[in-house]
């Protein structure tokens, strides 16, 4: 069992973690017609917007209640009310995601009571879903805020907000499965998961669906709210799902809520990268098709041939790359779900995890292929990473990698010095292949550079 270390440092040096409000806004951005609303100072929203814009290189719709020193002392109900009314008037959202920040959490605003009063005061808000989530940024991390938001999304009764001429629910002829997509998944990852599920004749209902909002596509015109994502009719069809697939341990809580509300059985998949992990996922899908759902149409009883070929391609990629992974020392600094997936995949390839640093507590931390994992910052990682062959973390690790004279593979949030983050896919057979080739090429280049330096040294001598 891995020992989890949580040193009591008086400050964070070269921070690793992103805040809960950032994670919450990311989850909200996976819903169509959404406007995330930060209840806090303007700077809180500006920070999240800058991080997300730099990472995805897309327009990010965020709004704020713009709390000031005076309103923080006297109370922020008027600011929340005015912000909601302004958003409704100017942006015409289908849904609003209201999240708190450290400022308003410290004050202790009664947000449920505030929303109730606002609805009573303004009947025009009767049919507008407003999903509230508590996300203090002085504790937890991006993954915590994201998970809490998904839990609130699936806990909300959207049938209570049906306007005239609105669609109550989407009913598909195929069996529907709910997919709870964790914060470790990129829009490209989610698209790959959807394609895999659809190949089995199932209809995936992804929450939140970033593959429809932050995948990097041109809209016909300017969008002041999210132009894609999980729709309200899809959210109303949650009771019709025959199974829930939770991708990432952090999605277990949301899966439990769906089971309690609708009796939908679920399974948690801690990772979807690596031969064994993807095999397990595909096997479960085949079992859902053949035994879990009511089906009245031709179905695919076994694993589609497409994935048999992809599996063989992954086996070949493993053979091609394992020479460069074997015995390599790797340092990781990632959110828990992503750390677990990456650490096990590297270990399966023969690499050794020399250092592991993460942002928050998780049951997965006790099941890592490493003796200890530290809940800390990038300074902790640097102290543990002397002599490593590879560092995997976000773009904030660039200077550290240069000081350690080790290559950096960018992963997590934010990645602001690399293009294509919205399309990047590292799950499934194809995503695993891409990861192995990406990292393998880095290690191959380092080995070639090292051999060149040795040959130059011998020649000079």
From Swiss-Prot:
SUPFAM superfamilies named in the record: Helical backbone' metal receptor (SSF53807)
Pathway: Cofactor biosynthesis; Fe-Mo cofactor biosynthesis
Annotated signal peptide: none
An example Gene Ontology biological process: protein-containing complex assembly
GO MF, any single term: nitrogenase activity
Presence of keyword rRNA-binding: no
CDD domains: Nitrogenase_NifN_1
Keyword terms, alphabetized: Nitrogen fixation
Keyword match Membrane: no
Task performed by this protein: This protein may play a role in the biosynthesis of the prosthetic group of nitrogenase (FeMo cofactor).
NCBIfam families, per database record: nifN
Protein name: Nitrogenase iron-molybdenum cofactor biosynthesis protein NifN
